[in-house]
From Swiss-Prot:
Gene3D superfamilies: Mannitol-specific EII, Chain A. Residues 6-150 form the PTS EIIA type-2 domain. Transmembrane segments: none annotated. The lineage of its organism: Bacteria, Pseudomonadati, Pseudomonadota, Gammaproteobacteria, Enterobacterales. Induction: Induced by L-ascorbate. Repressed by UlaR. The PTS EIIA type-2 domain is phosphorylated by phospho-HPr on a histidyl residue. Then, it transfers the phosphoryl group to the PTS EIIB type-2 domain. The active site is at H68 (tele-phosphohistidine intermediate). This is Ascorbate-specific PTS system EIIA component. The modification Phosphohistidine is found at H68.
């Protein structure tokens, strides 16, 4: 499943969302996937449990979080949601806080998680200007166009 196709088909983009805590921000992304029947509601708690156990493991770059759980923690099919926050939040990551872009990922198996999910997100942000381009997006179509331009340049 391609990042762009998943976001478009599942209508799982939310821009300039308001959240007061990192937990609320993660829930916005998971709720988009629940609404699209990509994950079960328990996927949210699995992500919180992971943070309790391992720390903010999914904050992967300055300003960017990629919340995800394991396939057996409620994943029905592979999919992504993308959330930008109006106000950046602390996720308690010593290097990459504050976060204002969340790409929540659900993968049906570890191989998909590594090869499909992470690689597409790395590709999107290989051009660091895409962080600010994404922050400037105000419509779903602007996000999809940005991903299309990035894929065309790759």
């Amino acid at each position: 499943m391609k990042l762009r196709d998943s976001l478009a088909e599942n209508k799982s983009i939310r821009l300039q969302a308001e959240a007061n805590t990192w937990q609320e921000a993660v829930k916005i992304g998971v709720d988009l996937l629940v609404a699209a029947d990509v994950v079960e509601p328990r996927y949210y708690q699995a992500i919180l449990d992971g943070v309790e156990q391992f720390g903010p493991y999914f904050v992967i770059a300055p300003g960017l979080a990629m919340p995800h759980g394991r396939p057996e923690e409620g994943v029905k099919k592979t999919g992504f949601s993308l959330v930008t926050l109006k106000k950046p939040l602390e996720f308690n990551h010593e290097d990459n806080d504050p976060v204002d872009i969340l790409i929540t990922m659900a993968a049906v198996d570890a191989n998909t998680h590594q090869e499909v999910g992470i690689m597409q997100i790395v590709n999107l942000f290989e051009d660091e200007e895409n962080f600010d381009r994404l922050r400037a997006c105000r419509t779903e179509q602007e996000v999809l166009d940005l991903i299309d331009r990035t894929n065309a340049a790759a």
